[in-house]
């Protein structure tokens, strides 16, 4: 026999995977702990390689690495193949009889010894370990029970060629669970003259080693092998009804042990990520009881065809009374199994122990759950949201525990997917990423639907802006305008009006600033103009004219807001800036001609006479007339200018004020200094104006709101109704999109897991595990060009993608056919592997 390459001294053992190291050590009967890490396995492999190269003795190595004597003889090694990449199935923790007395445990141990003696054969390799012996002392009894509970059973991978036969055998046992009791009853009632140990079961079992499925213990696997063998030779067992029976195994103790070990064990952890590709149908039945009748109906045809082709199996059925009709002997009403002798019509109920009562109660729950289903459920998609699939904690599970999908939504998603975990559905429903796959429903343009929804949302938001934001902006604009207008008077520390900052051209602005600043420096403070005889003062210190009132903003006036402009007496008509300037010049002329000597004392006015001064100013004005008409056409400024002229006219310091008013026209240096000083004080003046008049403005706004509260109430009601409708539309659209996205992403993930698993069975270099990060990237980052659904998921908003992935993880973790935990990797880099049953028409 050719020595494999990994036994070469130059071969690096660290390149082997953990599962390969385990298989190699198991093949050469080198014991290793079930919790052994890769470093420990490499050490044992190095010793094995030295033994293969003749450096040490293989016998001594095997003797030094044998299982501890306290382990159960049920820990066995099946027929080992040369396939080093064979998958080791998950370990199952065995739950023994709770609170058993010494007599029952002793009988159980004797029963195990008898069964193990029947299974000795050259084709079934059993580790040489001592049987469990439990003394009658209570202390020793308690220690033995603790050791039995702490065991973990190692079961090797079964060859894939025996999948069909074993599926039929296991499902046959599942369809007629009470047939196991019929077998035992028939065996125990046979003639006691023949010794049980003389019967050779190995000749009937052959090389087939039934893998222990998720809920089958060693003794149950033995019963399956016995039913598959189908030997027509009568089996002679001891008659337990005789009081002098040589074999202490009796009917009551056997049913007690069998009932306890037939209970489903809801295990949730596994020490190995690899498991047998053949799964018992008990997995899907236990997780979804509604599948019980459908699975029985579908597999009954395959069982009948197998019985017709195998005569020995049929003869064994005739011998022990095993038939498909025996399932009718169990009824939930009487809570007992009735065994009918093949040659007699009378039936007698079997005695029940505490363990068998629990088993019967569990079956009652399955029947009740099946009877309570009022609508058909797709048996091809099994989830266990009612049970915890795993007690391991992962980051994504912690993050999304509060957002798990409900059972109804999961059932709707599962019915659309058509996934297969029982090996009955079509392969087209399992492999979804193929070009010739025909969708069950017409293609739905997810992108266009989302675009339509968001476009409609934008229109509604625009209406919302018009109904609410525009009136709010109107309030703000009106308040700002009121602050500016009222700030023209009543601000004692204001050197010049803040609105002059926007006045153009600069020469005219600087002239007025200079005059106002000079007056302030001389102690002349701005004050409100007294109300004329034909006007009345408003509550916000603005002047209301009795005649000719016009609103500045028609839109706000319709809502009750009427910010009237500042009025002047009717005797003064000011319509244009030019008329204002003409009136200004006439006043200047009067002042100049009235006291020319005093005015001429100023250095800048020495060479000026009255006429030349006025003409010079007019020339300067008409140079900027067009700009003034276009920019400075505000009524507020006109009122302010007229008020300023009146104040200057009544001032005793008229001549000095006029000098500072017109000096920038001749001295530009002084103009620059004045403007800089005025601009530096502008922020302070604005704040003072706001603080001074905020109270009066708020009172005015409050009265305006009270006068038109019905209109704003109507706007609020319309806005609430519109917002509610938009919110409901968005919720419905998001729910539909999330459901569709979960269906597409789950189908892609399952198909990729199945393809990778199938490829790894033929190509040992392919890792059957697919990282979760890669699956998420396929759905939401890269997408698949052939799949339109995945291509649309890439363009969804990030929040919707996150919600879809949360539900995808919940669905995949709930499936019994997906391995969620990888103990050799960190939680953030975990991987999934398909360990379910493939359809019969999938070619390996």
Swiss-Prot record:
Broad class of where this protein is predominantly found: endoplasmic reticulum
GO BP annotation list: attachment of telomeric heterochromatin to nuclear envelope; chromosome segregation; meiotic cell cycle; nuclear membrane organization
Membrane topology: Multi-pass membrane protein
Keyword Flavoprotein: no
Transmembrane helix found in the keyword field: yes
InterPro entries: HeH/LEM_domain, Heh2/Src1, Man1/Src1-like_C
Keyword terms, alphabetized: ATP-binding, Chromosome partition, Endoplasmic reticulum, Meiosis, Membrane, Nucleotide-binding, Nucleus, Transmembrane, Transmembrane helix
Compositionally biased tracts (Basic and acidic residues): 395-407
GO cellular component: chromosome, centromeric core domain; chromosome, subtelomeric region; endoplasmic reticulum membrane; heterochromatin; nuclear inner membrane; nuclear membrane; nuclear periphery
Molecular function (Gene Ontology), one example: heterochromatin-nuclear membrane anchor activity
Binding sites annotated in the UniProt record for ATP: 605-612
Subunit description: Interacts with sad1.
UniProt protein name: Meiotically up-regulated gene 61 protein
Species assigned in the record: Schizosaccharomyces pombe (strain 972 / ATCC 24843)
Lineage of source species: Eukaryota, Fungi, Dikarya, Ascomycota, Taphrinomycotina
């Amino acid at each position: 026999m050719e020595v494999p390459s990994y036994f070469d001294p130059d071969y690096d053992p660290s390149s082997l995977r953990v599962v390969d190291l385990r298989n190699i050590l198991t093949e050469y009967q080198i014991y290793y702990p079930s919790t052994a890490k890769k470093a420990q396995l490499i050490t044992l492999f190095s010793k094995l390689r030295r033994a293969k190269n003749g450096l040490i003795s293989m016998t001594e190595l095997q003797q030094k690495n044998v299982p501890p004597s306290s382990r159960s003889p049920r820990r066995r090694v099946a027929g080992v193949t040369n396939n080093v990449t064979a998958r080791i199935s998950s370990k199952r923790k065995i739950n023994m009889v709770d609170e058993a007395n010494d007599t029952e445990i002793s009988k159980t141990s004797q029963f195990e010894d008898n069964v193990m003696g029947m299974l000795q054969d050259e084709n079934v390799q059993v580790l040489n370990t001592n049987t469990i012996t439990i003394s009658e002392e209570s202390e020793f009894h308690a220690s033995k029970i603790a050791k039995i509970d702490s065991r973990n059973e190692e079961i090797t991978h079964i060859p894939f060629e025996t999948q069909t036969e074993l599926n039929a055998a296991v499902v046959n046992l599942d369809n007629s669970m009470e047939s196991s009791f019929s077998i035992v009853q028939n065996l125990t009632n046979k003639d006691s003259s023949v010794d049980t140990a003389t019967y050779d079961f190995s000749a009937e079992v052959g090389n087939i080693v039934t893998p222990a499925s998720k809920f089958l213990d060693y003794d149950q696997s033995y019963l399956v092998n016995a039913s598959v063998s189908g030997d027509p030779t009568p089996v002679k067992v001891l008659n337990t009804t005789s009081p002098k029976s040589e074999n202490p195994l009796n009917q009551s103790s056997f049913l007690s042990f069998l009932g306890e070990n037939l209970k489903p064990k809801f295990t949730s952890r596994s020490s190995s990520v690899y498991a047998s590709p053949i799964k018992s149908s008990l997995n899907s039945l236990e997780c979804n009881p509604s599948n019980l009748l459908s699975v029985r109906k579908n597999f009954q045809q395959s069982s009948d065809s197998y019985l017709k082709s195998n005569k020995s199996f049929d003869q064994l059925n005739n011998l022990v009374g095993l038939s498909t009709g025996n399932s009718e002997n169990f009824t939930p009403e009487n809570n007992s199994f009735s065994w009918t002798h093949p040659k007699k019509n009378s039936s007698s109920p079997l005695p029940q122990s505490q363990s068998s009562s629990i088993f019967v109660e569990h079956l009652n729950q399955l029947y009740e759950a099946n009877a309570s289903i009022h609508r058909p459920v797709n048996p091809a998609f099994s989830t266990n949201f009612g049970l915890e699939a795993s007690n391991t904690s992962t980051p994504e599970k912690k993050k999304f525990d509060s957002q798990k999908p409900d059972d109804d939504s999961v059932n709707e998603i599962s019915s659309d997917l058509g996934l297969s975990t029982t090996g009955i559905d079509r392969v087209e429903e399992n492999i979804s990423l193929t070009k010739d796959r025909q969708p069950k429903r017409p293609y739905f343009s997810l992108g266009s639907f989302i675009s339509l929804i968001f476009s409609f949302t934008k229109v509604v938001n625009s209406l919302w802006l018009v109904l609410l934001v525009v009136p709010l902006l109107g309030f703000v604009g009106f308040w700002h305008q009121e602050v500016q207008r009222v700030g023209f008077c009543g601000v004692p520390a204001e050197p010049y009006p803040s609105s002059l900052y926007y006045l153009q051209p600069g020469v005219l602005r600087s002239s007025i600033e200079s005059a106002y600043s000079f007056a302030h420096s001389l102690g002349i403070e701005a004050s409100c103009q007294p109300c004329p005889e034909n006007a009345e003062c408003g509550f916000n210190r603005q002047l209301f004219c009795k005649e000719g009132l016009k609103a500045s903003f028609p839109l706000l006036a319709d809502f009750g807001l009427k910010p009237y402009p500042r009025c002047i007496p009717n005797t003064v008509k000011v319509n244009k800036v030019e008329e204002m300037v003409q009136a200004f010049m006439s006043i200047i002329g009067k002042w100049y001609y009235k006291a020319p000597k005093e005015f001429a004392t100023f250095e800048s006015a020495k060479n000026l006479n009255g006429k030349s001064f006025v003409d010079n100013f007019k020339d300067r004005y008409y140079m900027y007339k067009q700009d003034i008409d276009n920019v400075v056409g505000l009524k507020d400024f006109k009122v302010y200018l007229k008020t300023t002229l009146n104040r200057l006219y009544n001032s005793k310091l008229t001549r000095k004020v006029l000098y500072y008013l017109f000096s920038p026209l001749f001295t530009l240096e002084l103009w620059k200094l004045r403007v800089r000083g005025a601009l530096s004080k502008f922020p302070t003046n604005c704040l003072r104006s706001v603080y001074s008049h905020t109270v009066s403005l708020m009172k005015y706004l409050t009265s305006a709101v009270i006068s038109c509260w019905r209109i704003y109430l109507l706007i609020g009601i319309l806005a609430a109704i519109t917002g509610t409708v938009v919110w409901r539309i968005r919720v419905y659209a998001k729910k539909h999109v999330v459901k569709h996205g979960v269906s597409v992403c789950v189908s892609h993930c399952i198909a990729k897991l199945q393809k990778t698993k199938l490829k790894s069975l033929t190509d040992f270099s392919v890792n059957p595990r697919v990282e979760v990060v890669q699956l998420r990237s396929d759905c939401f980052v890269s997408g698949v060009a052939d799949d339109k659904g995945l291509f649309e998921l890439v363009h969804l908003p990030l929040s919707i993608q996150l919600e879809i992935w949360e539900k995808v993880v919940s669905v995949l973790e709930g499936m019994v056919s997906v391995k969620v935990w990888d103990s050799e990797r960190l939680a953030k880099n975990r991987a999934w592997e398909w360990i379910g049953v493939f359809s019969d028409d999938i070619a390996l």
